[in-house]
């Protein structure tokens, strides 16, 4: 079937008036490559140019007012090519002086007794408006004098040019309707054609809100249709592996562990085991705070797979993390399981032998990085794929690993506790297990906040920990100094400063510009206590486990979000020793102060993630480009979570009733297939 589009155009992008080769190249830089892209390039905000009554305006407010020109404008030139135009208007029965700087050409346009609309800053005492925009009363400008769309543009493209291009395209395209008449009527929604037109050219605020609501619901509904369809495919597949593990051997393994499972771990194990026994493929997210013991839960599941005759795989984001997992699992399993490590560093004969053992079934459990998804990595009988910190992998990487075991069971793990509203959006098709309990014997990390002038006192506190034979992390937001952020400390300067205080051999440096090999070497030295202090950027945020590290200093902590601060803090507090986290910050904003205060009040990652989401929004919560969040143009999973729930219910009803598979929805089914390529629909 040919490509299905939401928007169809009778001509190509370069046929629109004013779009030549140069403009075409600039538009492509904005990711506008077709007429459909152009029409869906929505404004980022709107300038409110609604005319108001000047009698009601506050002093020093930016106002848009309409009045009659009652004096001829005058222009005074001064300085080098500078000018001041003065004109008097009668506005709402008030005589007002209006001034415009460096716009002398307006003199010819401002005719005596004409009606004009002016936008500028109102000075009540002087009865004067410092103007920055003027609208003359021809029809085109009248349209702009209400809610004016503002687009993200780049040098070489003007707002007006882009608005004109979009206006022409909108007059000629066909916009298909995805929502049924019944659904639109039920929730009082507009047609998509009217909605997109309005988002570009709103008549008023109420009209704009209705359009935004319609488009957001359409996006969420389409997203949920994809989720629900995927659910149906998962549950009706006859390829799913049913794991008949040996429960007695599993119990013996759990009893042999050198510690007792927490109640939360036991609940998670039982939930996963129920999934493994079911005749449908497991698709579960295991989320738990830093240090909550997710790896032990994963290990028990891997052991269960071994007793059932299946292999398991664990994919993690970094080599150092893969090595740590492999080492701890080898110790945990002893001779009961054959654990292997596959990273980019494993090469030549060693790699060939490992792949041979994997394919013939000698290896029970394979731990690795993205090296696991290479074409020559073939499993004998994989029954469980575990991905750690899954929002740090691209969707395609996860999909390839999953497909190495056809319809194998999938467990995703994350130490970033995800608020319920976001979990629905990111992992909507998954069941979720949460570990909200720390293992016995762990002491809560003591978190404090110090100002920059208290730095020496913080150093003294760190020195006390080092004297006990412990280790410390020192975290900085920047790698090198920045002219834009002169007051922000950088990691290289701080590293050099600490070297002079503690000696070159005792201080290590870690940042994102280093090669993977150099980073691993530094982390290895820190793990083996060859280094006392590790000065680093946030590259240590994920999964690094050095139990002897009990002190963390985070410099310029107000530069980080709550979730990042919490993940960083989680690098300490990983043993029975008391750990400390000191935030050094002198925040200048209310948000910065609030963030520091919250961090000192709670160590609950679930509570912090909710607060972080409220303060920063979903894109920042996960980090740009890594999030796995659906790429909505209008909808916001936090602000629109109630709408998301309604969309999910409606999508579930459409699929479960079977209506979705009728002829009338064939166009929609094909669109979802073609535009969500990372999902298998066969």
Curated annotation (Swiss-Prot):
Monomer. SMART domains: DEXDc, HELICc. The lineage of its organism: Bacteria, Bacillati, Bacillota, Bacilli, Bacillales. Residues 454-614 form the Helicase C-terminal domain. Residues 50-145 are annotated as: Wedge domain. It comes from Staphylococcus epidermidis (strain ATCC 35984 / DSM 28319 / BCRC 17069 / CCUG 31568 / BM 3577 / RP62A). The gene is recG. This is ATP-dependent DNA helicase RecG. Pfam families: DEAD, Helicase_C, RecG_dom3_C, RecG_wedge. The keyword Chloroplast does not apply. PROSITE patterns: HELICASE_ATP_BIND_1, HELICASE_CTER. A motif (DEAH box) lies at residues 388-391. GO terms for biological process: DNA recombination; DNA repair.
